[in-house]
Regions:
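Hydrophobic alpha-helical transmembrane segments
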Residues: 1-6, 211-217, 243-247, 308-314, ...
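N-terminal leader/targeting segments
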Residues: 1-88, 97, 316, 687, ...
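Hydrophobic alpha-helical segments
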Residues: 1-20, 327, 428, 433-468
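Hydrophobic alpha-helical transmembrane segments in multi-pass membrane proteins
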Residues: 16, 43-47, 51, 55-57, ...
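Alpha-helical transmembrane segments of polytopic membrane proteins
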Residues: 25-34, 362-363, 421-426, 484-487
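Membrane-interface helix/helix-cap signal primarily in integral membrane proteins
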Residues: 63-265, 565, 606-610, 627-630, ...
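Non-globular, low-confidence helical/coil segments that flank catalytic cores
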Residues: 155-156, 160, 167-169, 210-211, ...
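Membrane-interfacial loop-to-helix junctions in multi-pass transporters
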Residues: 231-234, 290-296, 427
Length: 758
């Protein structure tokens, strides 16, 4: 076996892991392997430079084995897994409320809803019911894990190793998102962490305090040291430089600010931090013997990996650093590309499921970019001063290699990302070094560590001011929409062509123009021709996004995170018409955050009788033209016409092209809207979109819809049976996720845009 063979087989193993994303990926592996085998065996002189045809045959086998390995290592629920309780409760028509005992496995951290989230190792369970005779019908021992969310106050005192008892609603996580780019598939992300059910908890009792020691305790002490010296907000940012964002409760507005300017990596445990720490350690220990220097450097890297919670990106960075130290000890010049390939292969052999981790993917692509592209870019920037040349070349090389995948997942391009990376470099270096030193001192003497952390107050304040200022510049981010997998493959093909071919390297601008065209042309065509409507996967606030050439219409904005993510993936940079179906802040609180990311041109609401002060305050801070929709008078934008039939609660007709929808919100417990519709003539709609509490077959008998969309978690079996008997197609948003209407009148469930070619 030659070195070239080993490299080929390592690449084949990684390729097989990637092809496991596709249901028929094994056919792609066979086709690619057969083409390379045939080309090497019967091709011309160019093919003779490659490894032997036998090596390609072995590589094909390695790729197929890698696919099988991924499938075999994919977690599946055990016989006694707690997730099996959900269908048992449904089968007995029992409430989904349960009492669960188990041990806390991860540190509770806040989610965007303000609740604490963590994983619980399950030991026992018991069902609960308002009817005493039904409680305890199902109980016993169980295995597996639960993804638990708790009110912030209830989860504030929890830590790993505690044995607790929680009551709440047991549920199965939803799928959704792209089948290839699986970043937003909640069910899949939990499955990769050996979790198949969730618990929306409301009450917790601590049964056993568990061990007060562990890595979690070290992390908590570091966080407390920084918080005491800098305050919670600034302290969280500095702690993230040491621990990574997976272990620190960074305020979400700070996370979003870093993301908008292309600096998300600064808050993650990555190679940026390990490179700085290793360089500082080696510089400070220069007077010491060589073995001591390299030993201390290796110790700092291992400690960094432990504190970060062994995130895949941190492991990759630490292994690269250790490999570099080994090369220095042996007096050899390392081959970083070969080392990176070996580390990627070894990590995937250890855990092939890391191939789906976003941090793993972006970390390796960024490192690959630094290895192969940073120096050529720096050479072309010879007109800049040398220090500035390197500051520009490094982030530019990393950005070029991660951009196609980043666009495919998030759909956002940070316009000022390169400038932000250059300007923030010095403060980030200072905070990384200062944060690590204050953390290590704080582990031994907390007051001294906090005093050292206080010295970082003004650098932290400057960094946050800089990031927030750049993020507020006009056009700070552009939503280009999620790329299709073929676009991603072609873009990376162009990048590799520039890297490997000297001939095409000289024509890099031509390939750059081709890549930009490949992204922009589909985006422009889509914005000028697309006409579709999407009911988002939100059962708390019914949300609809209508895309048309005349402008984007959005109905309801209670879920800012879900809505802004959808708008970015669809390439929507402006909301032309925002509509609120009520005047309750609880239902419409997301508009402020949405407007900050995606500007709103016109805001209208249904003139409901109730309007709380928080809602009126939100309207005042929006600073957007506002008016109430008139009763029974259509208001139109392009091909979309909205008419308010009833204001309190809202009943709207939505005319989109030749299709008519009827939106019915019924928050009452007595189906009052059905009674109102019974005495009010309404033309039978093509689509009935319903959201509320109580649903009865009488509503369908009165309205006579052709199709039904229900913004709720689940559907009563009796209602489902009725709709099937009447042959009325229906979609339950809690089960189907996104429901999309096309201009031809068709409805489709869970059809992510970037599963297509473009």
């Amino acid at each position: 076996m030659t070195k070239a063979d080993a490299i080929l087989w390592a690449i084949a193993f990684i390729t097989g892991c990637v092809f496991s994303f596709f249901q028929w990926g094994w056919l792609g592996v066979l086709a690619l392997g057969g083409m390379l085998y045939s080309g090497r065996r019967w091709g011309g002189k160019v093919w003779l430079r490659l490894p032997s045809s036998q090596s390609f045959a072995i590589a094909t086998l390695v790729a197929l084995l890698a696919m099988a390995y991924v499938w075999l290592r994919t977690p599946q629920p055990g016989v006694n897994d707690i997730s099996g309780l959900v269908p048992r409760l449904e089968g007995l028509n029992l409430p989904s409320t349960v009492l669960v005992e188990g041990r806390v496995e991860t540190t509770p951290l806040p989610n965007r809803a303000g609740r604490r989230r963590f994983f619980l190792g399950v030991e026992r369970y018991q069902n609960l019911s308002p009817v005493p005779a039904q409680s305890g019908v199902l109980q016993g021992r169980a295995s597996g894990r639960l993804y638990v969310t708790l009110p912030a106050a209830a989860g504030a005192k929890l830590h790993p190793s505690q044995r607790i008892q929680i009551s709440g609603r047991l549920y199965l996580p939803r799928g959704g998102g792209s089948e290839f780019f699986r970043a937003f598939n909640f069910r899949r992300q939990l499955q990769l962490q050996h979790t198949f059910a969730g618990l929306a908890g409301n009450k917790v009792t601590i049964l056993d305090q568990g061990s007060p020691w562990g890595l979690w305790a070290l992390r908590q002490r570091i966080i407390q040291v920084h918080a005491q010296g800098l305050g919670d907000r600034y302290g969280a940012v500095v702690s993230a430089m040491v621990l990574g964002n997976r272990a620190v409760a960074i305020p979400f507005e700070v996370r979003d600010s870093f993301r908008r300017v292309g600096l998300s990596h600064a808050l993650a445990a990555s190679g940026f931090h390990t490179a700085i720490l290793l360089a500082v350690v080696l510089a400070l220990t220069r007077p010491l013997p060589q073995q001591w220097r390299y030993g201390l450097g290796a110790g700092v890297l291992v400690l960094f990996a432990c504190l970060s919670g062994f995130a895949p990106s941190a492991i990759r960075a630490v292994l690269m650093g250790l490999a570099g130290l080994v090369a220095l000890v042996n007096g050899q010049k390392g081959q970083p590309l070969v080392i990176l390939l070996a580390i990627a292969t070894a990590m995937l052999i250890y855990n092939p499921l890391w191939i789906e981790d976003i941090g793993f993917q972006l970390s390796f692509l960024a490192t690959l970019g630094l290895i192969v592209s940073a120096q050529p870019i720096s050479d072309r920037l010879d007109w800049l001063p040398t220090p500035l040349r390197n500051l520009v070349a490094v982030p530019l090389a990393a950005t070029l290699w991660v951009l196609p995948l980043s666009l495919a997942i998030f759909g956002i391009f940070p316009v000022y990302g390169l400038l932000a990376n250059v300007l923030a470099h010095l403060p980030l270096v200072l905070l990384t070094v200062g944060g690590f030193i204050s953390a290590m001192v704080g582990l031994l003497v907390p007051p001294v560590g906090s005093a050292l952390a206080w010295l970082l107050y003004y650098p932290t304040a400057f960094l946050l001011w800089l990031i927030q200022t750049i993020g507020q510049w006009p056009g700070a981010t552009i939503a280009l929409g999620s790329l299709g997998w073929l676009q991603v493959v072609v873009l990376y093909g162009l990048i590799v062509l520039v890297w490997l071919s000297p001939r095409w390297r000289r024509r890099w601008f031509l390939l750059f123009t081709l890549g930009v065209t490949l992204v922009l042309v589909p985006f422009i065509l889509r914005q000028n021709t697309l006409f579709q409507a999407t009911v988002l996967a939100n059962t708390q606030v019914p949300t609809l996004v209508i895309q048309q050439p005349a402008g984007t219409v959005v109905i309801n904005g209670g879920d800012s995170q879900g809505l802004t993510a959808f708008l970015a993936q669809e390439g929507i940079n402006r909301i032309d018409w925002a509509v609120a179906s009520d005047r309750q802040y609880r239902q419409q609180q997301g508009w402020r955050d949405i407007h900050r990311i995606t500007p709103i041109r016109q805001f209208t609401d249904v003139p409901t009788a109730k309007s709380d002060p928080a809602y009126r305050e939100m309207l005042a801070t929006l600073k957007v033209p506002h008016q109430s929709l008139p009763l029974r008078q259509p208001v139109q934008l392009g091909q979309v016409k909205i008419t308010v039939l009833r204001a309190d609660p809202a009943i709207l007709t939505l005319e989109m092209g030749n299709s008519q929808w009827l939106f019915v919100s019924d928050p009452s417990r007595d189906a009052a809207q059905t009674d109102w519709l019974a005495v009010t003539p309404v033309e039978p709609p093509q689509v009935l979109w319903w959201w509320g509490r109580k649903l009865t077959p009488r509503l369908f008998e009165i309205v006579k819809p052709r199709s039904v969309i229900l913004s709720r978690n689940a559907l009563d079996p009796a209602i489902a049976t009725y709709l099937k008997q009447k042959q009325i197609p229906y979609f339950v948003v809690g089960e189907a996720r996104e429901v999309r209407w096309q201009a031809d009148g068709s409805l489709k469930a869970n059809a992510p845009q970037n599963d297509g070619l473009i």
